[in-house]
């Protein structure tokens, strides 16, 4: 049971056994992940690997990998992934050399729906000025000058570094005297998303 805005990893795998072979396949229905912020992890090339499922040997292909951040609490549904496959199966016929002739057929397979119960963030110990960050972060305020002359400018950078929902919250606004002329901050992000979630830094 994840918390609101806590990363969830979803991996769709296709299992099959000999003598069945998969010669072609494509997604005919991709999950939309409603109520989640989602990021698909790139799979450069589908490859078949050996695996064990319920004590039996199988071939397996990792078809889709996604990282999700729930944007609502309560019961949320992960939609299924549907694949259209071209399957090769040995027939009872044999070729000139005595090898079994493969027979092709088309099949559609669908992963089942999954429900996830998303918990509300704890209220106990929640800061008054909480701005939505969920994860493990370091927060720094960087000032480029230690002393100032009249009418001289200075720069403050707010920087958050770590692992968590970095792209899903705003940095806190500085409370400054009205006598200072304040310019709009330049926002920058250096964030990568892997199966373990977002990692990197953001700054204003």
Predicted regions and their residues:
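Surface-exposed interaction/ligand-binding surfaces
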Residues: 1-204
């Amino acid at each position: 049971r994840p918390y609101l805005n806590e990363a969830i990893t979803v991996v769709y795998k296709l299992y099959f056994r000999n003598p069945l072979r998969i010669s072609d396949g494509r997604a005919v229905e991709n999950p939309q992940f409603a109520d989640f912020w989602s990021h698909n992890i790139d799979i450069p090339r589908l490859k078949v690997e050996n695996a064990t499922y319920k004590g039996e040997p199988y071939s397996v292909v990792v078809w889709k990998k996604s990282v999700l951040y729930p944007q609502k609490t309560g019961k949320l549904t992960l939609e299924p992934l549907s694949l259209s496959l071209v399957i090769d199966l040995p027939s009872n016929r044999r070729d000139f050399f005595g090898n079994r002739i493969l027979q092709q057929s088309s099949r559609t397979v669908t992963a089942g729906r999954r429900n996830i119960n998303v918990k509300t963030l704890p209220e106990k110990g929640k800061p008054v000025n909480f701005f939505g960050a969920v994860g493990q972060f370091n927060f720094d305020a960087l000032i480029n000058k230690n002393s100032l002359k009249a009418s001289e400018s200075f720069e403050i950078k707010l920087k958050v570094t770590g692992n968590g929902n970095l792209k899903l919250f705003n940095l806190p606004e500085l409370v400054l005297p009205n006598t200072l002329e304040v310019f709009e901050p330049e926002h920058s992000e250096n964030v990568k998303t892997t199966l373990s979630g977002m990692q990197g830094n953001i700054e204003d």
